[in-house]
């Protein structure tokens, strides 16, 4: 279908300024790479998301969903069809020890809201840069905590635009993975069950984790966080470091000198630079240690022609 027609129709469904053509997706990822989206939409509520899905299904238009772009590499050729950004779906409510957070809310912000209400259980998330939806998608975690420990249920939208509530068991959580990598559900909101705590103790733990993160991670450059999952009984960063790869650069992207598990965009790097460096690191580590590093970061989109 003609993308101009798609743009014109969706412009009648969403608020002014929330539908764009040929939007550069590097403006919507933490690592500042990514080509153009044919049509880019940023819904403000669930009804608008449903309208987009039903329209796309009617005309067989591919749809790609983005959170805040913290753990994704979008290829330099961009994304065909409709790209849906969920960054405006950000509501958070607190009732007793329960927090309900919508998909586009930053998980860091949710952890801070928990602190404000003297609730403990989300301290580990105080330095995770992703959205709530992204955190559920990959079962994000840090410093001994992970999303699956505090999630009780979530509201999702099916590929047909229907709303469903799923309990935690349906998520099939594992280490940095969930069922959402294999189905077409869109995570809309999450319900977290926390415990009452002491403000000063919660804040002290968050301050400690923030200090550790800032002292060990290369926050001065754009990055997608940990590139690889932790291999069994080992650490990706340790294997990369011992392979002599810190400082290895392809194009504008290099293996961080501060933390070998990170790849940073130091000089206008491209998605292809990232992909080539990832493959080089995987090949080198496997040749040296016999360990296959599995990507944690998602790669989506089309190659540049």
Swiss-Prot record:
It is found in: Cytoplasm. It comes from the Bacteria. InterPro entries: FAD-bd_PCMH, FAD-bd_PCMH-like_sf, FAD-bd_PCMH_sub1, FAD-bd_PCMH_sub2, MurB, MurB_C, MurB_C_sf, Oxid_FAD_bind_N. GO terms for cellular component: cytosol. Its cofactor is FAD. It catalyses: UDP-N-acetyl-alpha-D-muramate + NADP(+) = UDP-N-acetyl-3-O-(1-carboxyvinyl)-alpha-D-glucosamine + NADPH + H(+). Its main location: cytoplasm. PANTHER family: UDP-N-ACETYLENOLPYRUVOYLGLUCOSAMINE REDUCTASE (PTHR21071:SF4). This is UDP-N-acetylenolpyruvoylglucosamine reductase 2. It comes from Bacillus cereus (strain ATCC 10987 / NRS 248). The gene is murB2.
